[in-house]
Amino acid sequence: MRPQELPRLAFPLLLLLLLLLPPPPCPAHSATRFDPTWESLDARQLPAWFDQAKFGIFIHWGVFSVPSFGSEWFWWYWQKEKIPKYVEFMKDNYPPSFKYEDFGPLFTAKFFNANQWADIFQASGAKYIVLTSKHHEGFTLWGSEYSWNWNAIDEGPKRDIVKELEVAIRNRTDLRFGLYYSLFEWFHPLFLEDESSSFHKRQFPVSKTLPELYELVNNYQPEVLWSDGDGGAPDQYWNSTGFLAWLYNESPVRGTVVTNDRWGAGSICKHGGFYTCSDRYNPGHLLPHKWENCMTIDKLSWGYRREAGISDYLTIEELVKQLVETVSCGGNLLMNIGPTLDGTISVVFEERLRQMGSWLKVNGEAIYETHTWRSQNDTVTPDVWYTSKPKEKLVYAIFLKWPTSGQLFLGHPKAILGATEVKLLGHGQPLNWISLEQNGIMVELPQLTIHQMPCKWGWALALTNVI
């Protein structure tokens, strides 16, 4: 064989070898395929980012923000249940011929600035948001192809609210973008017809719900998909397992998306990604499954209420307590605000969000990316809650009341002589402590004036090398 022939022969041989090699491994997201059954879907591992995030912001906004009276269930309470205060409100403020649909053009969102919202959410210390893309009234905050003349492009704002907020969140913050979606609609004729057939007919999910869900995921790629409002229909009616199989296997967010447990009658607290179990769910003890406490700053409503007084809002102390209790017991806190019809975040909501952010700047180490500890709540000092970071050999004791004696008694941590160290987050200097005779330790807190305190509303001790 002549030397010049070698290159010509080498190429076919190399090609043959490449063809004989095994194919490269598939990307991680397609390594596991999920069947459209709860058994298969429930086995999906929740993306790690969600448990690490701990704190999110819920945003209830829609046409119900126009009357902004009583509740975001205004339409239902007025027209279906005919609750007197809602009926009287309409009689006193609107002409007799006024319909709920007439609120649509009044939902102007004229002061809505997605960048301002994003900056406030970033300042809150939250790690994800969830916006109501469609509530039970059926009005969509994007130009849904399946909600003719009852969406934010055709009516009211005449803007794609979902897109504007998605872009702002992803361009200006490190938060994950999520969407809430109501499966059913109170007064949609197709849903009512299906309901009258005991859900043997499936016109509504086939022509409305499922197409909109696919549209939302493909167009806006939410990393939280927060389902709600099954209308009493089972998951088979909604084809929830079929949709979730697509979401986990094929969708553009298949590797990072998290979902909740509201996918049909009987699924709540039983099937899905993380459990919500009920509104304002806060069990106060450890659960075996990842869960979320969705709750409201306004004690009585998810949507904005013009008649709310200052005592109707949770204080920052109460909100910090909710966060600490929830995270100590393995949950995430999803804290709700309700913007006005103009698209502004009211001063009281903004203040609470910024206060949470200032608290988390000091104490976030004891919240973000933490794990539950062997004890959640101290028995000697009940206002103490625990989190941990096992790899760093850290336990955090978050206490909500500063003891007047300057001594904090902790009944659960056991010190290791010569190894244990205690620090107050935001203070830095190691603190003196002594072991108690039975169990636990007593920590000598630093003597600080109110202006020297690293934060208000709650404090955290970092305990290194305790058992």
Swiss-Prot record:
Positions annotated as glycosylated: N171, N239, N377
Places the protein is found: Secreted
Modified-residue entries (Phosphoserine), positions: S301
Keywords for the protein's UniProt record, in alphabetical order: Glycoprotein, Glycosidase, Hydrolase, Phosphoprotein, Secreted, Signal
Site feature location: May be important for catalysis: C294
PROSITE patterns: ALPHA_L_FUCOSIDASE
Catalytic activity: an alpha-L-fucoside + H2O = L-fucose + an alcohol
GO terms for biological process, alphabetical: fucose metabolic process; glycoside catabolic process; regulation of entry of bacterium into host cell; response to bacterium
EC number: 3.2.1.51
Principal place of residence: secreted
One Gene Ontology CC term in the entry: endoplasmic reticulum lumen
Coiled-coil parts of chain: none
Record-linked Pfam families: Alpha_L_fucos, Fucosidase_C
Subunit architecture: Homotetramer.
Free-text function comment from the UniProt entry: Alpha-L-fucosidase is responsible for hydrolyzing the alpha-1,6-linked fucose joined to the reducing-end N-acetylglucosamine of the carbohydrate moieties of glycoproteins.
Entry's family note: Belongs to the glycosyl hydrolase 29 family.
Name the UniProt record assigns to this protein: Plasma alpha-L-fucosidase
Organism from which the protein derives: Homo sapiens
Name of the gene: FUCA2
